């Protein structure tokens, strides 16, 4: 009987440790001081490229990157050097173990604005919101005291990864002059 009691007490910490949930990982976001919205901002330099060339490269990138790019372009002004893109992508639910499922939880919408000057461009992603039955700004999901905070942390991590993918893809496309370096016929 003593042995059984000892065995039970020895196994108890393992059962308790197995029930512990790890804290969710929250991505760090840049919050614009004026608008108080989540934003991604960069001003990369592209030496030797004119504003017009950067504009053309962006239009090519957009048609390659987005499905139905023409529907996503809200503003395109080559003379002023500005393109505004309104895009969206789906987010998916996570189960209790933190594994992504195939169940769609709505769409995330964002506005990508790109301004061009000779040798550089400014990209800004802002106005991120969750579209389901109604629109919900993602800034509400930053509340770690929210009852659904664990799911919000998963969603925000996915959203941050998607935004960084958009930015890196755009930067790679604009840095590439498109010259194949082949024979000039």
Report the location of each language-model feature:
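Bacterial Sec-dependent N-terminal signal peptides
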Residues: 1-21
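Ser/Thr-rich, low-complexity intrinsically disordered terminal regions
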Residues: 19-185
